[in-house]
Each structure stands twice: as C-alpha cells, then as structure tokens.
C-alpha cells in the first residue's frame, strides 16, 4: 500500500505545527544527542553525546514509508519515531508516528501523559475523538476524517481512532514531546502488574467481579 504523494505535505505540516506548543523543556545548546553513557551530561532524562562526535545519522530515521503489520488483536500498528529512534530529538520537544489501520482496526482508547497530538489522515476513513475531563462533564469531541483532514488531541485526554472504511487507512501524527508516552486504558486497568483488586474494579465499573476477573485474565496475558 502506497501513501499518495500529494498528501505527504499534510503530514509535514502536522509535524511542523506540533513545534508550536512543545511541552519538553527548551534546550540551552544547539543539540543534545541522547547517548547511553554515564560519563555524559544529563539533560531532559538523557545523557548528551559529545557534540564533536555528533553526525547526521543522529538526526535521521528511515522507514516511515513501510506499512506496519496490523495482524493483531486491535487491527492497527503504530510506528514510533521518538528519541529512542532518533537520539537527536532529545530536548527538541517533538516526535512523530505513523499509524496503520486494517479495515475496522482501531487505535484503542489511550492517553499521552507528556504531549498533545496532531493527526493527519492520508489514506482511508477514520472515526476519531477524545473525551474531556470530569470538570468538563466528560464531553466527547469526535469527527469522521477523510484524506487530508487533521484532528488535534489535547495532552492527557483519552482519545481513539477507528477505521470505519472498507480499505486500510494510514495516518501520521506529530506529538509535542520527544517521548510523549502512552497509556492504553484497557491494558492499564485490567492488565496491571500486579492486578488491581477485582472487587475495586467491579464497583468502579459497575460490573460483576467474575467479569472483571475474566477481563484481567484476558489483558494480563497480552
């Protein structure tokens, strides 16, 4: 599957726009290429590589043209390009992902605790949305996206995407952190290690404890 070349600029715009409100601390030097070396200078959660040893490969990644494998339980695949893939992103306050969706596949409800997200759809049809906080009465903000459409997910809000079309879908998203993190709600609540007390979850979700135990057995094995 090939992404239309005419839509690639939208992905680039999405990433550029994510620069505006980066949540990571601003750097005080040209760059701080991340390195696993305890002798380095510790900046923003990473040690800095000696600037004299930095080269172009520290700012490079190849592979976002390759579709991810969506043959899994949720029917989607996220290819992440953050500070772990590009060490030069350290202190830059940005990262990028490619998301592939099989027909009816989804990126299930999740949050990014350290960054907001701006997503551009380049192929297929997605139903996307986020839910606001308790103080805002948990309102759902959702739209059906078509190629070229853009949607923003505020930092920390539970959000999702699902492919409602008959063909595979592809999206790119920029995040306002070098490592925005991800908390998948179902996996976190029902697949924690060690498990949360079933009785607590049963009351919280108004479910029978046996249902909770079944969910914990399912998600605990993922």
From Swiss-Prot:
Tell me which positions the record assigns to the signal sequence: 1-22
What is the disulfide pattern of this chain?
Answer: 32-48
List, for all copies, the residue spans of the domain called Cupin type-1. Answer: 62-213
Q: Which SUPFAM superfamilies match?
A: RmlC-like cupins (SSF51182)
What Gene3D superfamilies does the entry give?
Answer: Jelly Rolls
Could you name the domain of life of the organism this protein comes from?
Answer: Eukaryota
Question: In which tissues does this protein get expressed?
Answer: Expressed in stems and developing embryos.
Molecular-function annotations in GO: manganese ion binding
List the InterPro entries hit by this protein, alphabetically.
Answer: Cupin_1, Germin, Germin_Mn-BS, RmlC-like_jellyroll, RmlC_Cupin_sf
Q: Does the keyword Membrane apply?
A: no
Could you name the Gene Ontology cellular component terms for this entry?
A: apoplast; extracellular matrix
- What's a Pfam family this protein contains? Cupin_1
Q: Sugar-bearing residues?
A: 77
* Keywords assigned: Apoplast, Disulfide bond, Glycoprotein, Manganese, Metal-binding, Secreted, Signal
Q: Where in the cell is it found?
A: Secreted, Extracellular space, Apoplast
Which positions in this protein are listed as binding Mn(2+)?
A: 110, 112, 117, 159
Say yes or no: keyword Signal present: yes
On subunit structure and binding partners, the annotation says: Oligomer (believed to be a pentamer but probably hexamer).
**Chain's role:** May play a role in plant defense. Probably has no oxalate oxidase activity even if the active site is conserved.
| Family of this protein | Belongs to the germin family.
This protein's name? Germin-like protein subfamily 1 member 20
Name the species this protein comes from.
Arabidopsis thaliana
Q: Which gene name belongs to this protein?
A: GLP5A
């Amino acid at each position: 599957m090939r992404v239309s070349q005419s839509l690639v600029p939208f992905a680039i715009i999405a990433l550029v726009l994510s620069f505006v409100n980066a949540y990571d601390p601003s750097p005080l030097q040209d760059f701080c290429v991340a390195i696993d070396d305890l002798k380095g200078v510790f900046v923003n959660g990473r040690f800095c590589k000696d600037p004299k040893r930095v080269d172009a490969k520290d700012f490079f990644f190849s592979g976002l043209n390759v579709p991810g494998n969506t043959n899994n339980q949720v029917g989607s695949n996220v290819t992440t390009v953050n500070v772990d893939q590009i060490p030069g992103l350290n202190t830059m306050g940005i990262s990028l992902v490619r998301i592939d969706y099989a027909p009816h596949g989804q990126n299930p409800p999740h949050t990014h605790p350290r960054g907001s997200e701006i997503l551009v759809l380049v192929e297929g049809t997605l139903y996307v949305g986020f839910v606001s906080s308790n103080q805002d009465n948990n309102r759902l903000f959702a739209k059906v996206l078509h190629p070229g459409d853009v949607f923003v997910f505020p930092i920390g809000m539970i959000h999702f995407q699902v492919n409602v079309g008959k063909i595979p879908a592809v999206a790119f998203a920029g995040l306002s952190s070098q490592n925005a993190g991800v908390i998948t709600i179902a996996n976190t609540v029902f697949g924690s290690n060690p498990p949360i007390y079933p009785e607590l979850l049963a009351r919280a979700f108004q479910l029978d404890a046996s249902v909770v135990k079944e969910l914990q057995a399912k998600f605990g094995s993922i």
